[in-house]
């Protein structure tokens, strides 16, 4: 499948004008083109950079990969330790019991004993939704939290023992497990997701719903063991009325009932569908032939599903919340939305990355010939869509900026001038409820501002998809390089002297796609946060707090570029910038540190490798003059490694900056 020559065909030339380059890659190591310098790498820091770059780069046939794959129980063990620690700290160092008595108080963690006759020293505000989750589970005491923490440690120990057994003792079982990915996928669907959903539905019906009904009615909660029978549940429902869960006061929500129904139906679909239905590999030729033979393709599909589910949950966390008291805890709503949007974005990009690796290493181009022959049409249409959306979506803002500069507000796109309401705006209602001093918001009234920024969402998302789809479809071959099998997933930029291989590897497409994913998710969470907190402010400014009579800051000022810069970024950052010396100081310090990490990334992204190599050579010259010669010669990072370091700092710094900015603002204004 691999040729020792690349035929580079000019698209507008005849066959006699074909240019052939004889390029010998026989010395290149499989998995990375950095193997060309393998001889010198052992005496230079290049070996260190390669160690980082190749840490997860192993093929299906290696024994190491079988060990790692068999040790997946160790990963589950780490998750159990995390869960155990969460419940342990909730039992000993949180105000969960106080929050149960009065959910209007702020959930906090790490409450320590008095020091030098002082009160609790700035407990950490919990915005992860754990308190709401525990109440939805039916946990009403710290004893139950301690039991769960102990169970988590026991489960983690069992997982670690099972992982050790799979890695070192049961080699035959490991071999069978790793060579039958299709059966493993069925095991995941039936055993983990199917039976897990069924067990969770049973817990919601027998424990969570009765406990929440009793709490809402002010009745003492019995032992959970007494609620396991259907008779006990029926008695509670008959005596206390099931309508207690249908109230919309922000405390106990009917969606908890729908969650039980949803998980029961999902369990049936997964268990039956994975064995007999369309989810089984027996009735799915694509799964059995292609996806089932490649770990990377299986992982890519799973990342797609998980990432999509995370994004959907982010939308549901505010539009249709399941957990009790969530709607009146505004910092938690914001945190859940932002967190799951980021997770979904990273998972979806990771799906394209692993699909590209699988296409390069584990499949033949003929397997995807139907798709690959249409890739130019696919990319051509995507390019047209991106260009159309970009010009028209930004054109709306350019028009408004121009009209505002000319002093013609009546000619701007706005609710008060040229209205551009979404087609289905009437279907999305806004429900406001005042619960004590807190205000709960369910749903959002759509306006011209939403119409404009939603088209920006469409543009950024389609651009991200264009980059990632191009990287996937051209991962194995392209017009420039007709077979990338030995070049693999990532290879260096060789410049125009080698035909111009800059930015054509699948890794480079993932690199660029992550930046656009960052842009896409940033605009989404900016839109959500600004509209959410400005709606809260306008509700409080209204008479009685029951009907929103004032237009929000988002509706009035997000229709032009200056509004985003002035009203959202500059004005909204006042709390985090002025937080020093206040209980919000941690957010201010995080804001500063994250800005530094983000700025550090630019040093790697804006400079070339030659600059750093020449700087290193100058430092080495000085060392030689002083007869202090390092045994291992320093080498600059490769282009790919430098981009990876820059990308990592860019994403982490940007996310930390946004997170601290959001939380400081929402805690100070609506917390």
Curated annotation (Swiss-Prot):
Q: Which domain of life is it from?
A: Eukaryota
From the UniProt record, give one GO term of the biological process aspect: photosynthesis
**Mind telling me which PROSITE patterns this protein's record contains?**
PHOTOSYSTEM_I_PSAAB
Per UniProt, the keywords (alphabetical) are: 4Fe-4S, Chlorophyll, Chloroplast, Chromophore, Electron transport, Iron, Iron-sulfur, Magnesium, Membrane, Metal-binding, Oxidoreductase, Photosynthesis, Photosystem I, Plastid, Thylakoid, Transmembrane, Transmembrane helix, Transport
Binding residues for chlorophyll a: 603, 611
Tell me if Lyase is a UniProt keyword of this record: no
Q: Which reaction does it catalyse?
A: reduced [plastocyanin] + hnu + oxidized [2Fe-2S]-[ferredoxin] = oxidized [plastocyanin] + reduced [2Fe-2S]-[ferredoxin]
Q: How is the cofactor bound?
A: P700 is a chlorophyll a/chlorophyll a' dimer, A0 is one or more chlorophyll a, A1 is one or both phylloquinones and FX is a shared 4Fe-4S iron-sulfur center.
Locate the residues binding chlorophyll a': 595
Give the Enzyme Commission number.
Answer: 1.97.1.12
Q: How does it sit in the membrane?
A: Multi-pass membrane protein
A GO CC term?
photosystem I
Chain sites annotated for binding [4Fe-4S] cluster = 493, 502
Subcellular localization, as worded in the UniProt entry = Plastid, Chloroplast thylakoid membrane
Q: Does the keyword Iron-sulfur apply?
A: yes
Q: Which function does this protein serve?
A: PsaA and PsaB bind P700, the primary electron donor of photosystem I (PSI), as well as the electron acceptors A0, A1 and FX. PSI is a plastocyanin/cytochrome c6-ferredoxin oxidoreductase, converting photonic excitation into a charge separation, which transfers an electron from the donor P700 chlorophyll pair to the spectroscopically characterized acceptors A0, A1, FX, FA and FB in turn. Oxidized P700 is reduced on the lumenal side of the thylakoid membrane by plastocyanin or cytochrome c6.
Assembly information from the UniProt record: The PsaA/B heterodimer binds the P700 chlorophyll special pair and subsequent electron acceptors. PSI consists of a core antenna complex that captures photons, and an electron transfer chain that converts photonic excitation into a charge separation. The eukaryotic PSI reaction center is composed of at least 11 subunits.
Q: Which family does it belong to?
A: Belongs to the PsaA/PsaB family.
Name of this protein: Photosystem I P700 chlorophyll a apoprotein A1
């Amino acid at each position: 499948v691999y040729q020792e020559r690349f035929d580079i065909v000019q698209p507008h030339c005849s066959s006699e004008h074909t240019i052939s380059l004889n390029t010998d890659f026989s010395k290149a190591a499989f998995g990375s083109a950095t193997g060309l310098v393998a001889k010198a790498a052992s005496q230079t820091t290049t070996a260190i950079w390669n160690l980082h770059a190749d840490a997860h780069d192993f093929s299906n046939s290696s024994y190491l990969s079988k060990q790692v794959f068999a040790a997946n129980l160790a990963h589950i063990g780490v998750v159990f330790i995390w869960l155990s620690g969460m419940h342990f700290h909730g039992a000993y160092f949180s105000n969960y019991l106080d929050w149960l008595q009065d959910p209007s108080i702020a959930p906090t963690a790490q409450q320590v004993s008095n020091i030098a006759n002082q009160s609790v020293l700035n407990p950490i505000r919990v915005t992860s939704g754990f308190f709401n989750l525990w109440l939805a589970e039916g946990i009403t005491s710290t004893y139950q939290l301690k039991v769960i923490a102990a169970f988590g440690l026991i489960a983690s120990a069992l997982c670690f023992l099972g992982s050790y057994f799979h890695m070192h003792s049961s080699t035959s079982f490991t071999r069978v497990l790793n060579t039958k990915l299709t059966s493993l996928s069925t095991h995941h669907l039936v055993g983990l997701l199917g039976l897990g959903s069924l067990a969770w539905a049973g817990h919601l019906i027998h424990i969570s719903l009765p406990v929440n009904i009793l709490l809402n009615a002010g009745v003492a909660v019995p032992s959970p063991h007494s609620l396991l029978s259907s008779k006990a549940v029926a008695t509670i429902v008959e005596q206390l009325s099931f309508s207690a869960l249908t109230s919309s006061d922000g405390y106990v929500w009917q969606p908890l009932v729908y969650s039980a129904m949803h998980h029961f139906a999902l369990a049936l679909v997964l268990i039956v569908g994975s064995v007999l239905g369309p989810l089984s590999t027996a009735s799915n030729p694509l799964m059995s032939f292609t996806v089932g033979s490649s770990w990377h393709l299986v992982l890519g599909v799973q990342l797609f599903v998980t990432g999509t589910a995370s994004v959907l949950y982010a939308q549901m966390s505010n539009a249709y919340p399941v957990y009790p008291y969530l709607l009146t805890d505004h910092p938690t709503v914001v945190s859940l939305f932002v967190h799951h949007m980021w997770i979904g974005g990273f998972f979806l990009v990771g799906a394209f990355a692993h699909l590209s690796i699988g296409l390069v290493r584990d499949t033949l181009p003929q397997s995807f010939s139907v798709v690959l022959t249409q890739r130019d049409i696919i990319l051509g249409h995507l390019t047209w869509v991106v260009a159309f959306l970009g010009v028209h979506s930004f054109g709306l803002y350019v028009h408004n900026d121009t009209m505002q500069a000319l002093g013609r507000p009546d000619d701007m796109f706005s609710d008060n001038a040229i209205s551009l309401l979404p087609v289905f705006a009437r279907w999305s209602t806004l429900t406001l409820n005042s619960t004590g001093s807190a205000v709960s918001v369910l749903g959002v009234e759509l306006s011209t501002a939403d119409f404009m920024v939603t088209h920006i969402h469409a543009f950024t998302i389609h651009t991200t998809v264009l980059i990632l789809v191009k990287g996937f479809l051209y991962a194995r071959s392209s017009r420039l390089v007709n077979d990338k099998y030995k070049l693999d997933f990532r290879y260096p930029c060789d410049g125009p002297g080698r035909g111009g291989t800059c930015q054509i590897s699948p890794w480079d497409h993932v690199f660029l796609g992550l930046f656009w994913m960052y842009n896409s998710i940033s605009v989404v969470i900016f839109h959500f946060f600004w509209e959410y907190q400005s709606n809260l402010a306008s509700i409080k400014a209204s008479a009685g707090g029951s009907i929103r009579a004032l237009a929000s800051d988002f509706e009035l000022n997000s229709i032009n570029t200056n509004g985003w810069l002035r009203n959202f970024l500059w004005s909204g950052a006042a709390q985090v910038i002025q937080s020093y010396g206040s209980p919000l100081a941690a957010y201010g310090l995080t804001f500063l540190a994250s800005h530094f990490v983000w700025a550090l990334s630019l040093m790697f992204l804006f400079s070339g490798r030659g600059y750093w190599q020449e700087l290193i050579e100058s430092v080495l010259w000085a060392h030689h003059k002083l007869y202090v010669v390092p045994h291992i010669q320093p080498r600059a990072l490769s282009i790919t490694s430098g981009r990876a370091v820059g990308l990592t700092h860019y994403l982490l710094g940007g996310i930390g900056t946004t997170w601290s900015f959001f939380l400081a603002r929402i805690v100070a204004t609506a917390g």
